[in-house]
């Protein structure tokens, strides 16, 4: 889109324009990503992940090299290990505060509903509003 490098002033202007349009972007630290497809498993070690929030909808961009593993090549115990790896849900204080402010509930209740909704703020607010 832009040939060469962007100077810092252009970058700030672009970020301000995105913010004005309701878009927010940030990098998150990720150690490992595993994607299970029909015929293989893709493992990204130390990928770069960027989260773009556009009016409440989050889009994740993954950059890095994937290690492709054919499902036929994986031993049964490795399959179980991959399936049993628990994904820890990261619910931030800001997410909890947003639900508390929108629904006028306690922080404990907001956190519980966010966990039930897998961290989806909009779904949690809708659930508490009913």
Curated annotation (Swiss-Prot):
Alphabetical list of SUPFAM superfamilies matching this protein: UBA-like
NAC-A/B domain: residues covered: 8-75
Signal peptide stretch: none
Coiled-coil annotated spans: none
Any GO BP: protein transport
Matching SMART domains: NAC
Keyword tags: Protein transport, RNA-binding, Transport
HAMAP family associated with the record: NAC_arch
Subunit structure: Homodimer. Interacts with the ribosome. Binds ribosomal RNA.
Family per record: Belongs to the NAC-alpha family.
Descriptive protein name: Nascent polypeptide-associated complex protein
Species assigned in the record: Methanococcus aeolicus (strain ATCC BAA-1280 / DSM 17508 / OCM 812 / Nankai-3)
Gene giving rise to this polypeptide: nac
């Amino acid at each position: 889109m832009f040939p060469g490098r962007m100077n810092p002033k252009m970058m700030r202007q672009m970020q301000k324009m995105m913010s004005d349009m309701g878009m927010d972007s940030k990098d998150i630290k990720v150690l490992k990503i595993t994607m299970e497809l029909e015929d293989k498993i893709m493992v990204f070690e130390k990928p770069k992940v960027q989260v773009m929030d556009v009016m409440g909808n989050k889009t994740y961009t993954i950059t890095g090299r994937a290690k492709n593993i054919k499902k036929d090549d994986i031993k049964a115990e490795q399959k179980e290990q991959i399936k049993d790896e628990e994904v820890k849900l990261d619910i931030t204080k800001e997410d909890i505060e947003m639900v508390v402010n929108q629904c006028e509930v306690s922080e404990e209740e907001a956190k519980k509903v966010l966990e039930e909704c897998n961290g989806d703020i909009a779904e949690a607010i809708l659930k508490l509003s009913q």
